[in-house]
Amino acid sequence: MVVYVTLRRSVKNPMKLLLHACCGPCSLEPVRLLRAAGHDLTIAYLNSNIAPADEYAHRLATLRAWAAGEQLPVIEGPYDPAAWEACAGRVGEAAHDPERRAARCRACYRLRFEEAARLAAAQGFDALGTTLSVSPYQYTDIIREELERAAAAAGVRPLFEDYRPFYDEATHRSRSLGMYRQNYCGCRFSDAEAAAERAERKAERAASREAERAAHAEERAAAEAAQAARRAERAAYDAKQAKKRAVLKALREQ
């Protein structure tokens, strides 16, 4: 039977905790909260999903630079994109198929959590947690299921918490610290999906601006037409008055 731990209960039971982390910005609030609960933390960077390799290294460097200032140990696991492709990459393209996309992410979580759980058991950690649940763009329920599954198989406790309420604060803090903030989850599929979503939003904004310009053009055309009508009306009135004055002048001169 899995002994399930939450942040609220763990205040009375501080543990030696291995915290799987995907990047620096997503670690800020989970680390703050877990330390406040009294846990002894070590970060595990196990993310073979991240592509390309330069992106993987950039995120790791950002995480390590911040963790060093926090006196927080960071363990880097093996970077094995081929293993990730065999496990999660085989699910394939899924940008417009929510079920396949969720299946791909589940396989990705499973691979990384299994690696982290084995590491936690081998190095004598009491429990395993993750920072993935800080993001509102992740599958939180699946994260919880896979974390519990991996921890149970390795004989360590799962410590899950839904950190999404702290996402805005994590965003604010990471920007204030000047941290590198990636614009996609990590894998090559998410990179393409995020790019497509950004392009779609850009197109929507452009269409909105064009519609606004068109609406303003119609308003300007209507205003100009009204002004022209007023000028024509004034010109007709002036001509009529001039004609009256000419008639009166002719009568006076008779």
What are these regions (language model features)?
Residues 3-254:
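Nucleotide-activated chemistry modules centered on ATP-dependent adenylation/adenylyltransferase
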